[in-house]
A protein has these predicted regions:
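Short structured motifs
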Residues: 46-53, 65-67, 96-99, 110-114
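Short, structured coil/loop segments at alpha-helix boundaries
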Residues: 28, 61, 66-68, 116-118, ...
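Mature extracytoplasmic domains of secretory-pathway proteins
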Residues: 51-94
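Phenylalanine-focused residue identity feature
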Residues: 42, 65-69, 103, 128
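C-terminal motif of bacterial Sec signal peptides marking the signal peptidase cleavage site
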Residues: 5-8
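Sec-dependent N-terminal signal peptides
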Residues: 1-2
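Transition segment at domain starts
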Residues: 10-62, 142-161
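Short, solvent-exposed, Trp/other aromatic-anchored flexible loops in extracytoplasmic proteins
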Residues: 87-149, 160
Length: 162
């Protein structure tokens, strides 16, 4: 009788990584989990403007934008990429924004952030990418036993067409 024993750590059988498709960027988006299922959370760019950052005014204009998350709570805390874009929707600068950042002074549900871009005069808007970036688990390569599964797309970055 031959007994074949395989350690979960040495076997890639049954472990698979999948990457979600990037969702349609917009001023107001419904956040999507990694499987593509929409959450009951909406992220919205309230407004934006070009102005010097008060802590580094010598660096010139940056993109200052205000945003809100409707439907988020302490248990969901999704995160989406925010990107300043040009007229062709090419990202000029991006950063990940978490829903917990959307709480301003005096209980306001509106947060604000800054995006530094190389050519601020090209900015025509700020868009959110709807894919939830709040959790990225280990890959099969990193942990063959417990890793794998659906993953969000790579974070948006300058040069991406949204």
């Amino acid at each position: 009788m031959v007994v074949l024993a395989l350690s979960g750590c040495s076997s890639h059988w049954g472990c698979a990584d999948t990457t979600a498709e990037r969702g349609e960027a917009g001023v107001r988006v419904r956040v999507e989990e990694v499987t593509g299922r929409p959450l009951d959370v909406f992220a919205e760019v309230v407004d934006w403007r070009l102005e010097p950052h008060p802590q580094v005014p010598a660096e010139g204009d940056q993109v200052h934008f205000r945003f809100r998350f409707d439907g988020a709570d302490d248990m969901t805390d999704p995160a989406v990429d925010a990107c300043a874009v040009d007229e062709e929707r090419v990202a000029l600068g991006c950063r990940t924004i978490h829903s917990y950042q959307a709480f301003g002074p005096n209980g306001s549900p509106i947060g604000d952030e800054w995006l530094a871009v190389a050519d601020p005069e090209r900015v025509t808007g700020v868009l959110f990418v709807p894919n939830d970036q709040s959790y990225v688990g280990p890959t099969c390569e990193e942990d063959a036993k417990d890793g794998g599964g659906p993953r969000p797309p790579e974070p948006a970055r300058a040069g991406d067409r949204l």
